[in-house]
Amino acid sequence: MKKTVILSVIDGLGLREEKQGNAFKLAKTPNFDKLFNEYPNSVIQASGDYVGLPDDQMGNSEVGHLNIGAGQIVYTGLSLINKDIKDNKFKQNAKFIAAFNAVKKNNETNTLHLMGLLSDGGVHSHEEHLFKLIEAAHENGLKNVSVHVFGDGRDVAPRSILTSIKKLEAITKKYNYAIGSIMGRFYAMDRDQIFTRNEQALEVMMGKTTNYFTNASEYIKAQYQKDISDEFFIPAINKDYLAKKLNLKDNDAVIFYNFRPDRARQLSHLLIQSNLYNYQSKNQVKLSNFTSMMKYEGLDTNIAYEEMKITNPLGNILAKNGLSQLRIAETQKYAHVTFFFDGGNDVLYENEERILIDSVKADSFADYPEMSAAGITDTLIANLGKYDVIILNYANPDMVGHTGNLKATIKALEFLDFQYGKILKAIEKTNHTLFITADHGNAEITEDENGNPATKHTTSPVMLIVTDKNLKLNSGTLANIAPTILDYLKIPKPKNMLDSLIMNNKRTSK
C-alpha cells in the first residue's frame, strides 16, 4: 500500500524533565503519553549551531521551519550578520553606505532613522547590530541620527529592556544622537493586518502625538509603574527631539534593522507605500532611502543582507516526484508552513494546495488558549486520502506560551493533546503515517525558577515521533527531518541534505 505522510509541526514545544514552570509536564496529555510510549521517537536539536544560529542561541519559528523544509542547516540573518561584524565587514556594507549618503545630501536637515526591536533575543533583531550601525553612521559623518525603540518583552523577559536602554543612551549621548521614540512591538510589529497599531507607531515617529518623554529610562520606569511591560509600551516621542524637527519627514532615510521579515512587513509597507497590502496609510512620507536588514518578501527595499539560497526544499522534491501536498496553518503561522518551509521562496508547487485558518484576533492569546487548533484538525481530517503529504502547524503552544501564563499554556497543551487524539483515531487502519515534531522550545518553560512569567523561546530540544512501529530513529536536528521523510517515502534525497534518522538495519517494510 502506498504510504502517505502527515508532518505536524508544533510551534514552541520543547522537551524538559523538570516540572517547575513546565506546562507540558503539568498538563494532562494522555495522547502524547501514548505517542511517546508506543511509537518510535527521538530527540531533535532545534537551537544554536544545530540550526545555523550562534552557539546557545534559542531557536525560533522562522529558523525552525527553514531547517525542517530545507533538509540542511540554514545559516540565517543573525549568523550572517554576526560573521560580518566579526570580520569587520559590517560597517562597509554597500546598502548602509548608500543610506548614509542619501542623508548626507543635506546633512544639516536630513535625519537617518534606525528602527527595530531593541533586544538581545536574536529572534527578530539583535541590539549589537543597532550599536554597530550607530558607530558606522558617526564614522560616515552623519549629523542627525534618531533611534526608534521597539520594546521586546516576548523573546526576552517581559521587563528587561532597561539594560539595553542604558547601553543605547550611552552610545547616542557619545555621538550626540537621539532616542527618537519608544513603543512596544505590539504596535510597531503587528503582523495580523491590524494596521491601526502600525499607524499609531508611525504617527508617533512622525511627531503626530502629544505623548512625550524627555528621558527614555524614566519613561520606561513610568510604564512599569502602570503595569505596562516592554511589549506593550504606549508609543511616545522624545519631546526635545521633536523640538529640533528630527521627527520622521520627507527626504529622511530609514534603516529597519530587524532581520526577520514577518513582523517588519506591515510597518515597512506603510513607510514606502507599497502595494503588498490593500491598506494604504493616511500618514505618508517620501523617504530618500529605505533599507531593510534582510529581504522583506513582497516589498521593494534596499536589502543589506541576502538570505542563504535554498533551491531544492522538501516541497519542491515532492512536487518533482509527482506527489500532491497540502499545507494547513492558522494566520499566525501560515507563512511558516509556506514561505519559510519552502526556503524563503514564495512559490506554489504543482499539485500543492494551501488552506489558511483564521487566527482569533486577540490582545492576548491567554484568553483563547485553543486558538484555531480545532479548525486545523478538522481541515486535516476532512482532507485525509486526498493528498500524498500534508504539512501543518499548531500555533497555540508558542503563542500562548509567549504570554507567560502557565495556566493558559497548560490549557493550550491539553487542547492540543485532544487534537492528536482525534488525528490518531482518524488515521487508525489507514496508510497515513504521522510525523510529529516542533520548531523550537517555549511552552516547557513558562515560569522561571522564581515563579515569574517566562515568555521567550528556549534552547530545549524537541520531539520527533513517527507512528510506524516498524521504525527505530536516531537523534538529530531539525534539518534531518526532510531527508527522513524522503527516506520513508523511498525518494532519493539531494546530496546537500543531511542524513535520514531511520535506522535502516532496524527497519522492516510493511
From Swiss-Prot:
Mn(2+) 2 binds at D11, S61, D439, H440. It catalyses: (2R)-2-phosphoglycerate = (2R)-3-phosphoglycerate. Pfam families: iPGM_N, Metalloenzyme. Pathway: Carbohydrate degradation; glycolysis; pyruvate from D-glyceraldehyde 3-phosphate: step 3/5. The active site is at S61 (phosphoserine intermediate). Its EC number is 5.4.2.12. One of its GO terms (cellular component) is cytosol. It comes from the Bacteria. Substrate binds at H124, R154, D155, R185, R191, R260, P261, D262, R263, K333. Its cofactor is Mn(2+). Keywords: Glycolysis, Isomerase, Manganese, Metal-binding. GO terms for biological process: glucose catabolic process; glycolytic process. Signal peptide: none annotated. Binds 2 manganese ions per subunit. The keyword ATP-binding does not apply. GO terms for molecular function: manganese ion binding; phosphoglycerate mutase activity. Coiled coil: none annotated. Mn(2+) 1 binds at D398, H402, H457. Monomer. Catalyzes the interconversion of 2-phosphoglycerate and 3-phosphoglycerate. Belongs to the BPG-independent phosphoglycerate mutase family. This is 2,3-bisphosphoglycerate-independent phosphoglycerate mutase. It comes from Mycoplasma mobile (strain ATCC 43663 / 163K / NCTC 11711).
